[in-house]
Amino acid sequence: MARRPHNAPPQRETGPRVNERIRCPEVRLIGANGENIGVVTPSRAMMMAEEAGLDLVEISPNAEPPVCKIMDFGKFKYEQQKREAEARKKQHIIEIKEIKFRPGTDTHDYDVKMRSVLKFLSEGDKVKVTLRFRGREMAHQELGLELLNRVAAHVSEAEAGKVEAMPKLEGRQMVMMIAPK
């Protein structure tokens, strides 16, 4: 066991109360097979759990009286961890990927970048398409807008996503957001 600093508060136990930790005058007991036994004292419930070779676990502490069940606590914790891991595995964090273009981006470079855009959208990520202007290119913003409109048309044609934020100028760059369908 690791030492804790003398000024740190003691660790609070999380999770349901088990066996002797259940301190209340009476509990509503559910048997090992799921049958409702009724309202009994915690000591009587503990005896019944010991006879069955299982634990007494507080399922619903906020109920009146608290609901307890006779079950194998180790198995219960294992099942709970398995469910949480499954839920974590299923959830997907949406990331924002950025693809940078220039007003003079040529056809091959455009095709390569568009493949990346479509790949990111198929993986469920949002794509931020950035068009960077340098020097005198700022005078020809219509070329940049034309390129971004071409990107938007390409994405909607491939039915991979939809434009979430239309192109807008932010300083020396034009930005457009595309979300997956």
UniProtKB/Swiss-Prot annotation:
Cellular localization per UniProt: Cytoplasm
InterPro entries found in the cross-reference section: T_IF-3_C_sf, T_IF-3_N_sf, Translation_initiation_fac3_CS, Translation_initiation_fac_3, Translation_initiation_fac_3_C, Translation_initiation_fac_3_N
| SS bond partners | none
Q: Does the keyword tRNA-binding apply?
A: no
Cellular component GO terms, alphabetically?
Answer: cytosol; membrane
Q: Name one Pfam family in it.
A: IF3_N
Q: Which UniProt keywords apply?
A: Cytoplasm, Initiation factor, Protein biosynthesis
Biological process GO terms, please?
Answer: ribosome disassembly
User: Where does it primarily localize?
Assistant: cytoplasm
- Which molecular function terms from Gene Ontology are attached? ribosome binding; translation initiation factor activity
Query: What functional role does this protein have?
Result: IF-3 binds to the 30S ribosomal subunit and shifts the equilibrium between 70S ribosomes and their 50S and 30S subunits in favor of the free subunits, thus enhancing the availability of 30S subunits on which protein synthesis initiation begins.
Family (UniProt)? Belongs to the IF-3 family.
What's the name of the protein?
Answer: Translation initiation factor IF-3
Species for this entry: Cereibacter sphaeroides (strain ATCC 17023 / DSM 158 / JCM 6121 / CCUG 31486 / LMG 2827 / NBRC 12203 / NCIMB 8253 / ATH 2.4.1.)
